[in-house]
Amino acid sequence: DNFLKLKKNNLFIDIAKRLKAYQAENPDKKLIRMGIGDVTLPLAPVVVEAMKKAADEMGVKETFRGYEDSGSGYDFLKEAIAGYYKKFGVSLELDEIRVNDGAKSDCGNIVDIFGDDNIVLITDPAYPVYVDSNKMNGRTVIYADSDESNGFAAMPDPSVHADLIYLCSPNNPTGSAYTREQLKEWIAYAKANKAIIIFDAAYEAFITDPDVPHSIYEVDGAKECAIEMCSLSKTAGFTGMRCGYTVIPTALHVIASDGTDVSIAQI
């Protein structure tokens, strides 16, 4: 029944079909694609060479890699991710970082650890995966409008309760980004509601304004209420390769249905 609540057509597939039909009728027209956030350039040569080397290593007994022990990614990659966050003044432990096959997967899968009766707040417009993954689990989804009246930066309404909050900054699809002061307001709202923020930072590399955080963890208190997801799709052209990561701070705790205090990082 929950699957029947989804829209009949996938947004990106529908756009692709319309593009294909239009191009067939107008072969001389050059289109600027504003649909799915794909890349337009190939992988960097250094990435290609590293992948070739990694493939060669898999064919040698001494350098072959099988299952990774921690289940959350190789340390050499997590160390590189932690090093990247240090540029923003954010300190992460390796066991707070989970490497995945792209942010999209974790955006959908992360909700499995939360109760189906949770109320989910999503800024609108938003990446369709946020809505679909929660509707498939039967959750109530409410919206905070992002439009010209608020500079395309939806802010929390203290009179509205939510258990899960999806924020994307810079936003997909509007491109707007939250300032530190705006994120402070969302963090205060989340704590007041004992809610969890799922912060999508897939487009953080496009930020140039020094007042706009690359990570929600640049703001005090975020580690107690936020899970952050990021991707190499936009920073390294990995849309066809699938690699990203999720950060779950050890300081992030939730209350289970039986009243026990649970560390999400241990789930």
Where are these regions (language model features)?
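Short catalytic/ligand-binding loop motif for oxyanion handling, primarily in non-cytosolic enzymes
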Residues: 40-44, 173-176, 205-206, 236-239
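Conserved core of the PLP fold type I
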Residues: 61-190, 204-219, 227
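Walker B catalytic acidic pair
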Residues: 201
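Hydrophobic/aromatic beta-strand patches that form the interior of the parallel beta-sheet core
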Residues: 32-34, 121, 142, 198, ...
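Residue-level marker for buried hydrophobic side chains located in beta-strands
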Residues: 169, 197-198
